[in-house]
Amino acid sequence: MRGLLSTEVETVGGRTMFFDKNITFFGLNASDRTDALRQMALSLKEANLVTSSFEKGVLEREECFPTGLAVGTFGLAIPHTDSDKVIAPQIAFASLKNPVKFRLMGNGEEEVDVSLIFMLALKKSEDQITMLQRLMEIFQNQELLKEFAECKSLEDFDQLLKQVELE
Amino acid sequence: MKKLLIMCGTGIATSTIVTGKVKEWLEENGLQNKVKLYQSKISEELSRIDEYDIIVSTTLVPDNIQDKVINGVPLLTGFGKEEMFEQIKTQILA
């Protein structure tokens, strides 16, 4: 199998373009998934990375096509919506103070307690396949997910991105 | 040659990952000449879903087509991946 750590990732000024705007929340306080999604989408909107319809798009899509993933005992979610609501590609990150429930992707009934959210604001697929594959490689590693969940600051986060070669 | 559709809700994020993994797996197993891959979003495919021989979806599908759709989420989480590939293989060779 092709190793992801040997592949190239697009960088801007030495930093992966998908995390360069620091849309990050450490220990985000959210009452439920809608609240968490709203706060993250708002932050992307305020940075002019997405259009004003992005939030609505993400919320609606999450109801029709849920994005919760259960990786062993770990729950994470990768909310996203159509690319026409994205101005510039970016990934917003949040670790949650208390987990919130998401429905499982590809499964209408089961729910998972999510403590990490990667909100994907993406454009065309060809540009981001390497990054997405690397991200998924990380999602399959429970130890790394725990490290992401334990990030307390932007410094911790930056260091971890560098370690997993997402920076 | 069989037509294999990989779809998700938007056609840009998870279907991209799954397509990449399926492509790698086809090559590793010498099956790449037996299937043609299509990547799309569910809303564009429901009306012509019968044109495909094999369908992998990372997202929820309507009840009436559930039986013919393989759940692609194992390729995102790594759990249940082998069983999923077996299902695809069975359908390719059927």
Whereabouts are the PLM-identified features?
Chain A
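Cytosolic covalent-transfer regions centered on His/Cys nucleophiles
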Residues: 1-167
